[in-house]
Amino acid sequence: MSEAERKMQFLYALRSKGVTDKRVLSAMENIDRGPFIRGIFAERAYEDMPLPIACGQTISQPSVVGLMTQALKISPRDKVLEVGTGSGYQAAILSRLARRVYTLDRHSRLVREARTLFEEMNLTNITAITADGSYGLADQAPFDRILVTAAAEDPPSTLMEQLKVGGIMVIPVGQSDAVQHLIVVHKTEDGLEYDELRQVRFVPLLEGLGKDG
């Protein structure tokens, strides 16, 4: 199968799973997943499945990336916080849609590798930082959108505080060894509103920094 055919099949799979927003599809068409996957799994970059990366983490399956991004309803003026850089793939997608992206990860190795990819791809509106993402990034708050790519038993209150009124947060909620639910949180002047997207399985949101050098 040619590269063009694989990409067409990739986009068809996204649409069939409910990713229909044209801006999101365009971003995912233009950000190649391949460079974010290393080693023997690189040849499976166009398959709709999660794959292992360094530090015991995973790169999410593309359809879930698409659905989470779509649920954020990002405008070109938005400032976005991502908690859980991982491979950097999700942040790269966000960078095509938002004015500015801040992405945090507790593993310094993942942050270093993601920064290298962002530089190589000339994605200049992403700032990647080694930090405990459960505390957010207070010096850049508030954020128009927040995306959390690790599961918490409850949405962290600190992140809720750093979300603008009128903002949207997408986060997987549930225990790491049980069914998790992908939740969309809308922050209004009257409080918080919650919608459930689907069941998912994510690595847990952990406190502290990873011991990976």
Swiss-Prot record:
Annotated InterPro entries: PCMT, SAM-dependent_MTases_sf
Active site per database record: 60
Entry-linked Gene3D superfamilies: Vaccinia Virus protein VP39
GO molecular function, one term: protein-L-isoaspartate (D-aspartate) O-methyltransferase activity
The keyword Glycoprotein appears for this protein: no
Species assigned in the record: Roseobacter denitrificans (strain ATCC 33942 / OCh 114)
Record-level GO cellular component terms: cytoplasm
Enzyme class: transferase
Pfam families associated with the record: PCMT
Catalytic activity: [protein]-L-isoaspartate + S-adenosyl-L-methionine = [protein]-L-isoaspartate alpha-methyl ester + S-adenosyl-L-homocysteine
Family matches, as CDD domains: AdoMet_MTases (cd02440)
Localisation: Cytoplasm
EC numbers on record: 2.1.1.77
Swiss-Prot/TrEMBL keywords: Cytoplasm, Methyltransferase, S-adenosyl-L-methionine, Transferase
Family: Belongs to the methyltransferase superfamily. L-isoaspartyl/D-aspartyl protein methyltransferase family.
Gene Ontology biological process terms, A to Z: methylation; protein modification process; protein repair
UniProt protein name: Protein-L-isoaspartate O-methyltransferase
